């Protein structure tokens, strides 16, 4: 348990909202965020090619959403949010942080709605299998 806490603290330092996004993912899917950390062509660092399934498309849309955020770094931003009646509610006054939260909220909901498409064959998916031309956001 102590090692997990140390890893979580280190990950938060690397990517400010990773922990928050992970909590959203777990709330909507009951799966660890690690299940989505290296999945398909878009879940995880970077992304290229064609999304492999609806789950991977959630990550593609999430990447596109981050690309529209202006005024803060989505990967380093810590935002306000809460869980109310099974829903994720983004809060706070900063429009940029709220936009980052919305990107994460929509992706977490998307993962929950597409759990039936999650296929373990796309876990640890090689980017060499993602050589098709990338779609436009």
UniProtKB/Swiss-Prot annotation:
Record has DNA repair as a keyword: no
GO MF annotation list: calcium ion binding; calcium-dependent phospholipase A2 activity; phospholipid binding; toxin activity
Disulfide cysteine pairs (residue numbers): 41-130, 43-59, 58-110, 64-137, 65-103, 72-96, 90-101
Gene Ontology biological process terms from the UniProt entry: arachidonate secretion; lipid catabolic process; phospholipid metabolic process
Superkingdom in the source lineage: Eukaryota
Any single GO CC term annotated in Swiss-Prot or TrEMBL for this entry: extracellular region
SMART domains in alphabetical order: PA2c
Residues annotated as catalytic: 62, 104
Top EC category: hydrolase
EC number: 3.1.1.4
Location(s) in or outside the cell: Secreted
Keywords, sorted A to Z: Calcium, Disulfide bond, Hydrolase, Lipid degradation, Lipid metabolism, Metal-binding, Secreted, Signal, Toxin
CDD domains, alphabetized: PLA2c
Catalysed reaction equations from the record: a 1,2-diacyl-sn-glycero-3-phosphocholine + H2O = a 1-acyl-sn-glycero-3-phosphocholine + a fatty acid + H(+)
Tissue expression summary: Expressed by the venom gland.
Alphabetized InterPro entries for the sequence: PLipase_A2 (IPR001211), PLipase_A2_Asp_AS (IPR033112), PLipase_A2_dom (IPR016090), PLipase_A2_dom_sf (IPR036444), PLipase_A2_His_AS (IPR033113)
Secretion signal, residue range per the UniProt entry: 1-16
Cofactor: record remark: Binds 1 Ca(2+) ion.
Residue numbers binding Ca(2+): 42, 44, 46, 63
Family the entry assigns: Belongs to the phospholipase A2 family. Group II subfamily. D49 sub-subfamily.
Quaternary structure note: Does not form a complex.
Protein name, as recorded: Acidic phospholipase A2 VP8
Taxonomic source organism: Daboia palaestinae (Palestine viper)
Higher taxonomy: Eukaryota, Metazoa, Chordata, Craniata, Vertebrata
């Amino acid at each position: 348990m102590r090692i997990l806490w140390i890893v979580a603290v280190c990950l938060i330092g690397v990517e400010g909202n990773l922990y928050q996004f992970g909590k959203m993912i777990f709330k909507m899917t009951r799966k660890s965020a690690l299940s989505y950390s290296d999945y398909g062509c878009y879940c995880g660092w970077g992304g290229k090619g064609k999304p492999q399934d609806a789950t991977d498309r959630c990550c593609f849309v999430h990447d596109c959403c981050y690309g529209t955020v202006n005024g803060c770094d989505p990967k380093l931003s810590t935002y306000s949010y809460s869980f109310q009646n099974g829903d994720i509610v983004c809060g706070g006054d900063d429009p940029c942080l709220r936009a980052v939260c919305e990107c994460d909220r929509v992706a977490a909901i998307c993962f929950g709605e597409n759990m039936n498409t999650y296929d373990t064959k796309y876990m640890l998916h090689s980017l060499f299998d993602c050589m098709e031309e990338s779609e436009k956001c």
